[in-house]
């Protein structure tokens, strides 16, 4: 499982020009989490990802999402598992198929909510437009 976590002051995701998820957090900051589920991920990788999103000290003042009750915008992104070593077209064979990935993304969202974290989401499998105001910029790649 891979995720790109970006510290933001606001972020939104739209489908067909309709906002389906948004966070606005100019005081605490928040996290835009682009998460890709891999075909070879372990059954409990989602739990590690929940801990990383909640507890990494990547917000202002070395605080975590849990420390300051910051919101998370969670967006599924299978393209994080694209392989580009050969040719001119990425291979997506390392990404989990949709029927496997979608419930894992839901487990991540639920796991964050169970920690009291506000979670907004994109729409799985949809063509989305993601807008964000990055802080820093501060972006990390998480693999688990």
From Swiss-Prot:
Give the main location: cytoplasm
**Regions annotated as coiled coil:** none
Record CDD domains: Dtyr_deacylase (cd00563)
| Pfam families linked | Tyr_Deacylase (PF02580)
Motif Gly-cisPro motif, important for rejection of L-amino acids: positions: 136-137
Assembly description: Homodimer.
By sequence similarity, the record places it as follows:
Belongs to the DTD family.
Q: Could you tell me what this protein is called?
A: D-aminoacyl-tRNA deacylase
Q: Which organism is it from?
A: Corynebacterium glutamicum (strain ATCC 13032 / DSM 20300 / JCM 1318 / BCRC 11384 / CCUG 27702 / LMG 3730 / NBRC 12168 / NCIMB 10025 / NRRL B-2784 / 534)
């Amino acid at each position: 499982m891979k995720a790109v976590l970006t510290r933001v002051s606001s972020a939104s995701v739209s489908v067909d020009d309709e906002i389906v998820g948004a966070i606005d957090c100019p005081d605490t900051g928040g996290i835009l989490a682009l998460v890709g589920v891999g075909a070879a991920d372990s059954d409990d990788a989602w739990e590690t990802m929940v801990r990383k999103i909640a507890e990494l000290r990547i917000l202002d003042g070395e605080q975590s999402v849990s420390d300051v009750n910051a919101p998370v915008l969670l967006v599924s992104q299978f393209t994080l598992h694209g392989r580009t070593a050969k040719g001119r077209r990425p291979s997506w064979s390392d990404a989990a198929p949709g029927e496997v990935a979608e419930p894992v993304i839901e487990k991540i969202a639920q796991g964050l909510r169970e920690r009291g974290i506000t979670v907004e989401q994109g729409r799985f499998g949809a063509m989305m437009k993601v807008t964000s105001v990055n802080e820093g910029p501060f972006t990390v790649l998480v693999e688990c």
